[in-house]
Amino acid sequence: MLSRATRTAAAKSLVKSKVARNVMAASFVKRHASTSLFKQANKVESLGSIYLSGKKISVAANPFSITSNRFKSTSIEVPPMAESLTEGSLKEYTKNVGDFIKEDELLATIETDKIDIEVNSPVSGTVTKLNFKPEDTVTVGEELAQVEPGEAPAEGSGESKPEPTEQAEPSQGVAARENSSEETASKKEAAPKKEAAPKKEVTEPKKADQPKKTVSKAQEPPVASNSFTPFPRTETRVKMNRMRLRIAERLKESQNTAASLTTFNEVDMSALMEMRKLYKDEIIKKTGTKFGFMGLFSKACTLAAKDIPAVNGAIEGDQIVYRDYTDISVAVATPKGLVTPVVRNAESLSVLDIENEIVRLSHKARDGKLTLEDMTGGTFTISNGGVFGSLYGTPIINSPQTAVLGLHGVKERPVTVNGQIVSRPMMYLALTYDHRLLDGREAVTFLKTVKELIEDPRKMLLW
């Protein structure tokens, strides 16, 4: 049988282990509990610390309990993207470890080949873990962060901050500096003084008495023959973002895959500009839409594609895909690069409906709010370089599409009409197409049809 002393020592050890567990639990609860529970935890922690230091006090046996489910962290993962996207680059975290985040509040932004994806927190709580750094590559399903569910900390509660160490008051600091300076002065006085060297008295003549110096040309300092200052030659290296990298890959892929060829034509914009001038104010008043050129050109392309369906088709393996719908990809320039949001079923929309959709998508693109759905698909692309002053150019096919139409600037040029030289607002059109699917005759016919519809917009009513 164990002796009484041995049993007593074992009991004390057991009590200490229970207190230690309670103290650790109290420390954990203080970081995450409500105000009332925080006070209770603080009391347990202080009492337990006293007991563990050797003083005899009574400690309640576990006055509160912590369950793993109550404080279990929520894992936040990289969300699913489009079928063609499986990874991206972490652009930034909006929170740091220890910060409180509300439910549905933005936690991180992921940059993909097409758009930026925002990741929101599914719960309210404290951020306990961030697994990546900006510019790290993240894949779908990977854990981005962990959030421990909980309420927002009340004002005045939370971990007690360590009291600042006492600092000497300014007056004390000044006195200390004065004392140190006095000690230094006394030390200097105690040191033997060196005999001062006799100073030579120098009498400077007055300005009026000073003789004027005459400098001959031979005595003048020589001027540097080469006073050229080199121009700065600095270089700055900036890492390409994922969108720019993807654009570069796709454009090169298009050049390597398609048998690209470009055909040109010019269109007289007089009738379209006159119609726009007549109805512009009325359209803005009724619909709030600015009547531009893109809606009419898009509609003209959908009508011309009915006669030349290969323009709207695609090559997939050893098959040609023909479509009875036309999804127009509209090229929009953004600070991060060129994007091509899609106007769905443009063949079924009116000119104003197309114009409205283009304006909506353009605003979303410039604000960085495009979704993957806005960017997916597209059967034919229109690029309007004329808004930037382009006169002439050859666009690149937006693979896997078959053709792209490039619009250029409207310029007044002399043209011959009925034997007379007149000035007309003219625009160059450029159609780049994949010669594997589209023959030259079909490409020229398509572009000629677009030209005729734009030069006489009333013909669109006949289709």
From Swiss-Prot:
Composition-biased stretches (Basic and acidic residues): 184-212
Domain of life: Eukaryota
Enzyme Commission numbers on file: 2.3.1.61
Subcellular compartments: Mitochondrion
Modified residues (Phosphothreonine): T340
Catalytic residues (positions): H435, D439
Sequence repeat extents: 185-190, 191-196, 197-202, 204-209
Keywords for the protein's UniProt record, in alphabetical order: Acyltransferase, Lipoyl, Mitochondrion, Phosphoprotein, Repeat, Transferase, Transit peptide, Tricarboxylic acid cycle
Catalysed transformations (reactions): N(6)-[(R)-dihydrolipoyl]-L-lysyl-[protein] + succinyl-CoA = N(6)-[(R)-S(8)-succinyldihydrolipoyl]-L-lysyl-[protein] + CoA
Region annotation Disordered: where it falls in the sequence: 144-237
GO cellular component: mitochondrial nucleoid; mitochondrion; oxoglutarate dehydrogenase complex
Alphabetical list of CDD domains matching this protein: lipoyl_domain
Pathway given in the UniProt record: Amino-acid degradation; L-lysine degradation via saccharopine pathway; glutaryl-CoA from L-lysine: step 6/6
PTM sites of type N6-lipoyllysine: K114
Single GO biological process annotation from the record: cellular respiration
Domain Lipoyl-binding stretches: 73-148
Further remark: Present with 7970 molecules/cell in log phase SD medium.
Subunit structure as annotated in this protein's UniProt entry: Component of the 2-oxoglutarate dehydrogenase complex (OGDC), also called alpha-ketoglutarate dehydrogenase (KGDH) complex. The copmplex is composed of the catalytic subunits OGDH (2-oxoglutarate dehydrogenase KGD1; also called E1 subunit), DLST (dihydrolipoamide succinyltransferase KGD2; also called E2 subunit) and DLD (dihydrolipoamide dehydrogenase LPD1; also called E3 subunit), and the assembly factor KGD4.
Record function comment: The 2-oxoglutarate dehydrogenase complex catalyzes the overall conversion of 2-oxoglutarate to succinyl-CoA and CO(2). It contains multiple copies of three enzymatic components: 2-oxoglutarate dehydrogenase (E1), dihydrolipoamide succinyltransferase (E2) and lipoamide dehydrogenase (E3).
Name this protein carries in UniProt: Dihydrolipoyllysine-residue succinyltransferase component of 2-oxoglutarate dehydrogenase complex, mitochondrial
Source organism (scientific name): Saccharomyces cerevisiae (strain ATCC 204508 / S288c) (Baker's yeast)
Gene encoding the protein: KGD2
